[in-house]
């Protein structure tokens, strides 16, 4: 889950307001099933789910913010987003066909009719660990800056340890 936490921290430019976690140690002393809810000061909420014992290996991140709900499945990989467009810019994309996977649905609410836009992105599947190793080697050879530097890695680890601590306390 530490990699998923790192991804969330890189996507959300805000301080963490609160962490909630639940899970279980089923096979031994390590957490095998983990659910974490990270709430940021900006109002963004990220739900992370990870399981080492499920029939299908699970790594999903769900983020919620005003007018946008995103589900990222890191195993497939794919990203699905539901956007309530208040600016009508997505409506133009649908009309012009500039975003092929984008669909539009109208929903009647107490505030009137709202448009919800659904988009599904399926990025090229890559071996994340191999990419990370290659980036590390490249940084050594070129004295470059890694995608995840020590400070960012430490922050992700601190959050992961806090999640583990909360699971242990609650379990």
Regions found by a protein language model. Give the residues of each.
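C-terminal helix-rich "cap/oligomerization" subdomain common to oxidoreductases
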Residues: 41, 121-123, 130-171
């Amino acid at each position: 889950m530490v990699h998923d936490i790192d991804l969330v921290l890189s996507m959300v430019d805000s301080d963490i307001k609160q962490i909630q976690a639940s899970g279980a140690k089923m096979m031994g002393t390590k957490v095998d099933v983990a659910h974490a809810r990270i709430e940021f000061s900006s109002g963004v909420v990220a739900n992370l789910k990870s399981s080492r014992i499920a029939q299908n290996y699970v790594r999903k991140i769900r983020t919620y913010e005003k007018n946008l709900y995103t589900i990222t499945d890191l195993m497939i990989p794919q990203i699905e987003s539901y956007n309530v467009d208040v600016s009508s810019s997505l409506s133009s994309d649908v009309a012009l066909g500039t975003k092929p996977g984008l669909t539009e649905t109208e929903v009647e609410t107490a505030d009137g009719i709202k448009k919800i836009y659904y988009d599904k992105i399926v990025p090229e599947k890559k071996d994340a660990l191999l990419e990370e190793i290659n980036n590390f080697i490249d940084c050594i050879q070129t004295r470059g800056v890694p995608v995840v530097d020590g400070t960012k890695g430490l922050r992700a680890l601190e959050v992961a340890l806090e999640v583990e601590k909360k699971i242990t306390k609650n379990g």
